[in-house]
A protein has these predicted regions:
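Charge-rich, low-complexity N-terminal segments
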Residues: 1-19
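Structured alpha/beta reader/binder surfaces that contact nucleic acids or chromatin modification marks
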Residues: 15-31, 47
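Long, contiguous binding/interaction regions
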Residues: 19, 52-53, 106
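Short, conserved beta-strand/beta-arch hydrophobic-aromatic motifs that form part
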Residues: 31-89
């Protein structure tokens, strides 16, 4: 988990995401780059990334981005963008493992389902 090295929060959140998906989507794979950890099935559906790596003064240490075929309406999202006709990206700032509550776990599983 070299990408999350040095981030206690990042390591804990990645472990929680793995735990959540292990039971419902055991076929999930990970691709780690210098900038992110991407979770995939047939397609990518979630990305954990550290904004401070690029925006030194960023307020959030960690962001979970979820790809869905539709827009979710929630004030919890920092930003929602529509980069492609069939994809909505939902950016959630994560300040604690507790932020991955039942609502977020539901969104994560929905994104994994949609990625096929």
């Amino acid at each position: 988990d070299r990408f999350m090295a040095g981030s206690v929060l990042g390591t804990a959140v990645l472990a929680r995401v793995r735990e959540v998906l292990a039971s419902s989507h055991p076929d999930v794979t990970e691709r780690t780059t210098v900038s992110q950890v991407a979770l995939r099935r047939r397609r990518g559906f979630a990305i954990l990334w550290r904004p401070r790596q690029y925006l030194g003064d960023a307020a959030s240490e960690l962001v979970l981005s979820l790809a869905l075929p539709h827009r979710l309406e929630s004030p919890r999202f920092k930003e929602v963008v529509h980069p492609a006709r069939t994809t909505w990206m939902h950016h959630l700032e994560v300040a604690s493992v507790d932020d991955l509550d039942a609502e977020v776990v539901g969104w994560l599983r929905e994104a994994a389902d949609a990625a096929g």
